[in-house]
Amino acid sequence: MVLLRSLFILQVLVRMGLTYNFSNCNFTSITKIYCNIIFHDLTGDLKGAKFEQIEDCESKPACLLKIEYYTLNPIPGCPSLPDKTFARRTREALNDHCPGYPETERNDGTQEMAQEVQNICLNQTSQILRLWYSFMQSPE
């Protein structure tokens, strides 16, 4: 039992240490892609739904770190979020405009129920939209 707990803690620490530093990204290109493409995908998925969960970030690299995490990692009740069009386009933008961006292995969500809980997905999508807004307002 102690060994399993130690392995779990080690896994968490390794994942935390393997996060990408988004400071070398081409923010101008990513901003254009967001404004012209990703924004429309996000608002289309939300279909006008609004949620009060608000999380901001202090800089463009910090925003991209949160955007990547919330967009590309499945959450309980919404395992298919990383497969949405806006998520695929976000992944492409990061791959194309962040030198050396290593997409880490993602949890594929197979442990999750097959049926999504619509409200959870909409809430997560709303949070991602807010983070993109914060990205647009943040200094480099």
Swiss-Prot record:
Disulphide bridges, residue numbers: 25-98, 57-63, 78-121
Gene Ontology CC annotation, any one: extracellular space
GO molecular function: cytokine activity
Sorted UniProt keywords: Cytokine, Disulfide bond, Glycoprotein, Secreted, Signal
Domain of life the protein comes from: Eukaryota
Inserts into a conserved IL7R hydrophobic pocket, important for IL7R-binding (site feature) positions: 37
Sugar-modified residues: 21, 26, 123
InterPro entries reported in the protein's UniProt record: TSLP (IPR029189), TSLP_sf (IPR038329)
Compartments, as annotated in UniProt: Secreted
Signal sequence range: 1-19
Quaternary assembly: Interacts with a receptor composed of CRLF2 and IL7R. Binding of TSLP to CRLF2/TSLPR is a mechanistic prerequisite for recruitment of IL7R to the high-affinity ternary complex.
Reported function: Cytokine that induces the release of T-cell-attracting chemokines from monocytes and, in particular, enhances the maturation of CD11c(+) dendritic cells. Can induce allergic inflammation by directly activating mast cells.
The protein, known as: Thymic stromal lymphopoietin
Gene name tied to this protein: Tslp
